[in-house]
């Protein structure tokens, strides 16, 4: 670029005028902003939100304590302890997920052989202190019990893609 061209660009403020023209073009176009608490956009059926533990229809928890979800978790957010029952089946005594560590990758859900751990469509949850986002087995089972119909419907809708 020659010195004369540079002089005219800076003297006549062409960059500024180009920026103002761009701003003016978008000023009168339709806005795409969503006012979140009042308006909500549709959520993908594959959205990965709050975790839940599921039960069978007879009320027994599905988790067989294989610890695959704990092994596959890249953030080390899952802690499982188990014991063997009288009928030689393993069940969890402790199943904790630290949501402050969790990256919501979905590996735990994919690795579970019995579809025990699932990620729900729940995206609005919070904690006022760090311990509020540490979910124990009872808390995860309560979430699963409360939202079982929605979880089952989402699993059925996604079954052909799995």
Swiss-Prot record:
Keywords: 4Fe-4S, Cell inner membrane, Cell membrane, Iron, Iron-sulfur, Membrane, Metal-binding, NAD, Quinone, Repeat, Translocase, Ubiquinone. One of its GO terms (molecular function) is quinone binding. It catalyses: a quinone + NADH + 5 H(+)(in) = a quinol + NAD(+) + 4 H(+)(out). Its main location: membrane. GO terms for biological process: aerobic respiration. It is an enzyme of class 7 (translocase). It is a peripheral membrane protein. Binds 2 [4Fe-4S] clusters per subunit. It comes from the Bacteria. Coiled coil: none annotated. [4Fe-4S] cluster 2 binds at residues 73, 102, 105, 108. SUPFAM superfamilies: 4Fe-4S ferredoxins. Its EC number is 7.1.1.-. NDH-1 shuttles electrons from NADH, via FMN and iron-sulfur (Fe-S) centers, to quinones in the respiratory chain. The immediate electron acceptor for the enzyme in this species is believed to be ubiquinone. Couples the redox reaction to proton translocation (for every two electrons transferred, four hydrogen ions are translocated across the cytoplasmic membrane), and thus conserves the redox energy in a proton gradient. PANTHER family: NADH DEHYDROGENASE [UBIQUINONE] IRON-SULFUR PROTEIN 8, MITOCHONDRIAL, NADH DEHYDROGENASE UBIQUINONE IRON-SULFUR PROTEIN 8, MITOCHONDRIAL. Belongs to the complex I 23 kDa subunit family. This is NADH-quinone oxidoreductase subunit I. It comes from Burkholderia pseudomallei (strain 668).
